[in-house]
């Protein structure tokens, strides 16, 4: 089967959508399919030609973004007035135009028109939404008399207009509906997100296809030893939907020794200021790591006594790190700001994991997930 994957991020980036695109491409190539990855971001100094040979896939680069691995574009402005003006400008730009959505999606469509050969299945990964809009524009330009031979699948983790993180102008609702009309299916990771998509696309076109990983070649540490409670968090923090400050405030009240390892993808100035404040108070009890490669991360997580998951305050997203947590086979305490229970946390600190979260990882096996996509063709 001839398969194309359109994605903004790919290996070696440490991002859930990069993991998804990479695992799908690698597994489909392993199964003998002809795989082409259309990639919007180029990491400086990375050898994509060598990666193509290793995976037996084709990588077609679209030069929309070029950056260093782990780098994040952060605007630094010390003047409070200019900082407020910049924030207002960015907010208006995002609310009314969604940044460079229209310009970049048009460029994506043009690149696809020039480079896309006949495919049996095309999977476009959202985040950013311009992937979906770009492919929809490409499909819309196809001649009306073209025989339908390709199955187009939009893969999304969070709706664009109905996002609980970002407010946008009303017309984006109709743009999103127009986009989904050009896809045969919309795949989302969890059924909890269906109500958010129901106003945008017929229910029968929505398919539940979760995040996926290769679980066959995972190296885990032996059972953890040592008397000092050691626990970890991996992923990202946000100021709004996943703010960790309440947890750090509790940790500062504990008299006993512990080690809390925090694994983050990149440095965010707002989150860094929070971490720095509490690292001064907690000292060696708080250990912060950045940009740790996934296989190394899994091993490090498996060395801990237990793991913690700070849940989103949104209902449409399922953190992909929960799959990684399940792979490590370590107990997981999951909570948010409102459900955090100091007594349960204390029980975990003393080896009582009766309230551990149950994570069934079989549905997230890459072999299962790749078949779910193939079955749609």
Regions found by a protein language model. Give the residues of each.
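Carbohydrate-associated surface elements
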Residues: 192, 211-212
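A conserved catalytic-core segment of Leloir-type glycosyltransferases
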Residues: 43-103
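Acidic donor-binding loop of glycosyltransferase active sites
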Residues: 300-316
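Nucleotide-sugar donor phosphate/pyrophosphate-binding loop at the beta->alpha transition
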Residues: 146, 151-153, 160-178, 215
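Conserved catalytic-core segment of nucleotide-activated headgroup transferases in glycan assembly
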Residues: 215-216, 226-275
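Nucleotide-activated donor-binding/catalytic signature segment of Leloir-type glycosyltransferases, i.e.
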Residues: 264, 272-296
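Membrane-proximal helix-turn-helix segments that form the acceptor-binding/catalytic region
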Residues: 23, 103-106, 130, 169-188
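A charged, aromatic-enriched C-terminal amphipathic alpha-helix characteristic of glycosyltransferases
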Residues: 350-377
């Amino acid at each position: 089967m001839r398969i194309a994957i359109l994605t903004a991020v790919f290996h070696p980036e440490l991002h859930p959508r990069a993991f998804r695109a990479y695992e799908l491409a690698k597994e489909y190539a392993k199964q003998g399919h002809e795989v082409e990855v259309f990639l919007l971001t180029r990491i400086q100094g990375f050898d994509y030609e060598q990666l193509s040979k290793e995976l037996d896939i084709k990588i077609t680069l679209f030069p929309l973004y070029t950056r260093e691995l782990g780098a994040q574009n952060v605007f630094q402005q010390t003047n409070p007035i200019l900082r407020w003006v910049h924030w207002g400008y960015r907010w208006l730009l995002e609310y009314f135009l969604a940044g460079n959505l229209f310009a970049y999606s048009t460029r994506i469509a043009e690149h696809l028109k020039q480079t896309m050969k006949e495919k049996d299945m095309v999977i476009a990964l959202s985040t950013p939404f311009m992937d979906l809009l770009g492919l929809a524009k490409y499909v819309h330009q196809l001649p009306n008399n073209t025989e339908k031979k390709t199955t187009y699948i939009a893969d999304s983790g969070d709706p664009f207009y109905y996002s609980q993180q970002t407010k946008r102008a009303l017309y984006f609702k109709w743009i999103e509906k127009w986009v989904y009309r050009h896809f045969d299916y919309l795949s989302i990771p969890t059924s909890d997100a269906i109500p958010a998509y129901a106003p945008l696309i017929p229910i029968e076109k929505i398919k539940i296809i979760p995040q996926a990983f290769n679980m066959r070649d995972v190296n885990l540490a032996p059972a953890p030893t040592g008397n000092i409670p050691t626990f970890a968090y991996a992923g990202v923090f946000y100021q709004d939907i996943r703010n960790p400050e309440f947890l750090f405030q509790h940790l500062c009240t504990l008299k006993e020794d512990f080690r809390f390892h925090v694994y983050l993808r990149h440095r965010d100035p707002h989150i860094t200021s929070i971490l720095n404040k509490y690292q001064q108070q907690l000292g060696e009890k708080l250990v912060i790591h950045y940009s740790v490669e996934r296989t190394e991360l899994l091993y490090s997580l498996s060395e801990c006594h237990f793991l913690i998951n700070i849940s989103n305050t949104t209902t449409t997203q399922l953190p992909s790190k929960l799959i990684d947590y399940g792979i490590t086979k370590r107990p997981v305490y999951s909570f948010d700001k409102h459900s955090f229970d100091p007594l349960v946390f204390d029980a975990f600190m003393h080896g009582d994991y009766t309230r551990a979260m149950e994570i069934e990882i079989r549905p997230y096996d890459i072999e299962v997930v790749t078949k779910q996509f193939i079955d749609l063709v």
